Amino acid sequence: MSSINITNVTVLDNPAPFVNPFQFEISYECLTSLKDDLEWKLIYVGSAEDETYDQVLESVLVGPVNVGNYRFVLQADSPDPLKIREEDIIGVTVLLLTCSYMDQEFIRVGYYVNNDYDDEQLREEPPTKVLIDKVQRNILTDKPRVTKFPINFHPENEQTLGDGPAPTEPFADSVVNGEAPVFLEQPQKLQEIEQFDDSDVNGEAIALLDQPQNLQET
């Protein structure tokens, strides 16, 4: 059983201009206290054929991780268009929200993102060079792809078992080519996080979220 469960993800400011920051309101529950922080990442897939074009837009550490229910807003800059091939800017790509504990990724939420011009004439007659300030992104929030990976949340309890736990396989295929995302070396520590009791989660607090998304595992 996982020690951390995502209970809700709300995509804010969507649709939005391509250059606007991403904003995700994330609610999750912690079933057992953890010694280390959780690491949340937002990854933009720049090319379906070449993962070297993936961009880690944000990586933050969230803690302490005590038993309870939590909610925070993850904000990330838009991807750098100069690091995306011109032919890959317009069209459909993937955005990945991941969470890891002690360098072990245990959940990944994938969204399709459609980038297109907000002007009908530009859509019908696209310019040779992409006009990035005219591009609008639309995150398709109705059917996020959720993948869970079994990990050891309490390795300190198995220090006497010799070599430790065997490598684990994911419950479902990755959203993108079955590959793990690129990790940042020095993630930032996120300070603003809200904890609320069970009555909030079961009652009004969750109801206040705009356009809550039901996360269905695949």
UniProtKB/Swiss-Prot annotation:
SUPFAM superfamilies: ASF1-like (SSF101546). InterPro entries: ASF1-like, ASF1-like_sf. It is found in: Nucleus. Coiled coil: none annotated. Its main location: nucleus. One of its GO terms (biological process) is DNA-mediated transformation. It comes from Arabidopsis thaliana (Mouse-ear cress). GO terms for cellular component: cytoplasm; nucleus. Belongs to the ASF1 family. Interacts with histone H3 and histone H4. Interacts strongly with the N-terminus of TOUSLED. It holds the Pfam family ASF1_hist_chap. Histone chaperone that facilitates histone deposition and histone exchange and removal during nucleosome assembly and disassembly. Keywords: Chaperone, Chromatin regulator, Nucleus, Phosphoprotein, Transcription, Transcription regulation. It comes from the Eukaryota. This is Histone chaperone ASF1B. Phosphorylated in vitro by TOUSLED.
